[in-house]
A protein has these predicted regions:
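Conserved small/polar residues in nucleotide/adenosyl-binding loops
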Residues: 489-496
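Cysteine-centered iron-sulfur cluster-binding motifs in ferredoxin-type domains/subunits
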Residues: 392-402, 439-455, 468-484
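Non-heme di-metal
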Residues: 1-337
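A cross-kingdom feature marking solvent-exposed beta-strand/loop segments within repeated
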Residues: 43-44, 372-387
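Short, recurring structural edge motifs at helix starts
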Residues: 13, 341-345, 389-393, 438-443, ...
Length: 506
């Protein structure tokens, strides 16, 4: 149950993970279709993929509106396939596979509506709609408990909207400013196919490729492929599609091997290089999307351009034989960290400023606090305009902070480092819980107050051991600690799967 802002942000992050987990499988099926064939099926999969991107943006807008910071740049964000849907009941596995009846059956399981009376489920859900119902209930509860002015503190200018980003698919980008707009954003996601029970199979939008047609939800679009026939007005879930027939040719497909991994090609440098190029491009694209979700919404357009490059790379991979005489290579969708350029570094000048090299953005954030003074979230307030190389004040006396204005020369600043150089192992304290531990080093503390909330402090929460609710709060506290005082280390176990997916400061 979602009862705090920390819970809400945790579950919104899960929703972003969940939406993203469907994208690599959809793209593998889409890219495996040979050019010029299966036109209708290509349109279906492409439309669903585009809407999954929309759903990520809508969820991110809710997170931004409530003071959160969406994250896409951490290794666990890209699932290792085959995998169950993140935070689901794990009743089925999702594969990276070619376009086939089996892959479409898998997509139907992903998008299946729940029964109308299915309860909300914030974890271990059978359908995505149950999870979104829990998000809706959490938003309503927090709005009633805190009021919209306390709950919705984020800067709307940081959201991805029609004013910042061109969106050519069905549905709408919604700027979230209060409970009503947040619920509309969730409704957009649910009605496009990840919903509860559709007595009406149409989602209220026009088909993006055929504007004269009403659009059906994701589940029913994939059903059209299996049936080789479109739904039309008057059709129902029980009747099935009765509209125009179309050709589905399962043979006009690159025979990509299921669930490829880079480790399968360590003895083939040429293939490994292509896989690395694809994975670096994909990981870099996620980093651009993360930036667009954190105050630079216009950057999202760059990610669209990268998608075309990824399509070319994926199709090149799918033409390379694996060597078994039957299958070809395929994209592996594996996380790679950002390449650090030799030109990116911070120079500490003697008795002078910090000199930042490499066009590194300088961002100012402020703390959002609760009624008891506890820190709830970081809110981005400004990205400073700066050159590729810029100087930051180290003497503390600049009149143009955070930038250096030369004051250090006038006051004869002594820049001798006085920080302690003790080994971390000698100064840190380890708080041990069941399946999770936190390393605390108070010598780094800057008193940002993220290590306690209305319920408790991090030490008391750690003492609760296996309490899942306590672990959620501990993860949120350590993830937001700006100084590195509190670092979260997890020991994943079968009954502690949520923690293994959480981004942390460690």
């Amino acid at each position: 149950m979602i009862t705090t802002i920390e819970d809400l942000h945790e579950h919104l992050q899960w929703a972003i993970e969940l939406e993203h987990a469907t994208i690599p499988p959809y793209l593998c099926a889409l890219y495996s279709i040979k050019d010029g064939s299966n036109i209708e099926s290509v349109e279906v999969i492409q439309s669903v993929f585009i809407e999954e991107m929309l759903h990520m943006a809508l969820v991110a807008n809710i997170m931004i509106a409530t003071g959160g910071s969406p994250k896409l740049d951490y290794p666990e964000f890209i699932a290792k396939y085959p995998t169950p849907l993140p935070h689901s009941d794990e009743s089925f596995q999702v594969d990276l596979n070619k376009f086939s009846p089996e892959s479409i059956e898998c997509f139907l399981k992903i998008e299946r509506p729940a029964n109308a009376d299915a309860p909300s489920q914030d974890e271990g859900f059978a359908s995505i709609g149950q999870f979104y119902k829990a998000l809706e209930e959490g938003l309503v509860y927090l709005s009633q408990k805190l009021g919209d002015k306390v709950l919705f503190t984020g800067n709307p200018d940081h959201q991805v909207t029609a004013e910042t980003t061109y969106y050519g698919g069905a549905g709408h980008l919604i700027c979230v400013t209060d409970l009503n707009s947040a619920l509309k954003a969730l409704e957009e996601v649910v009605e496009q196919g990840e919903g509860l029970d559709h007595e009406n199979i149409f989602d209220g939008d026009k088909n993006m490729f055929h504007p004269e047609r009403e659009e059906v939800g994701h589940y029913f679009r994939f059903l059209e492929i299996l049936e080789g026939r479109n739904f039309q007005i008057g059709d129902t879930a029980k009747s099935g599609p009765s509209g125009e027939k179309f050709i589905v040719d399962w043979d006009q497909v690159h025979p990509m091997a299921a669930n490829p991994a880079s480790e399968d090609y360590t003895d083939n440098p040429a293939v490994l290089e292509k896989l690395t190029t694809f994975n670096q491009e994909y990981s870099d694209m996620l980093r651009v999307i993360e930036k667009s979700f954190n105050g630079e919404p216009k950057l999202l357009g760059q990610a669209v351009g990268v998608m075309y490059e990824l399509k070319i790379l994926a199709k090149e991979l799918m033409e390379i034989p694996t060597g078994d005489g039957k299958t070809t290579v395929g994209p592996t969708f594996e996380y790679l960290p950002r390449k650090i350029s030799d030109s990116e570094f911070i120079e500490v000048r003697e008795n002078g400023p910090y000199v930042v090299h490499g066009d590194i953005p300088l961002i100012r954030k402020k703390r959002i606090t609760g009624q008891k003074g506890e820190a709830i979230a970081w809110q981005k307030t400004k990205t400073h305009e700066s050159d590729t190389i810029y100087e930051l004040c180290r003497c503390g006396k600049s009149a143009n902070k955070p930038f250096c204005d030369g004051t250090h020369d006038r006051i004869n600043f002594d820049g001798t480092e006085t920080a302690r150089t003790s080994k971390i192992s000698e100064t840190q304290e380890i708080l041990q819980g069941d399946g999770v531990r936190v390393k605390v080093d108070n010598s780094y503390c800057m008193h940002a107050k993220f290590c306690f909330n209305q319920k408790s402090g991090i030490r008391k929460l750690m003492a609760k051991g296996a309490d899942d609710d306590a672990k959620i709060h501990v993860s949120a506290m350590t993830e937001r600690c700006p100084s590195g005082t509190c670092l979260l280390y997890t020991s994943p176990s079968p009954r502690d799967k949520r923690q293994s997916r959480m981004p942390s400061s460690a």
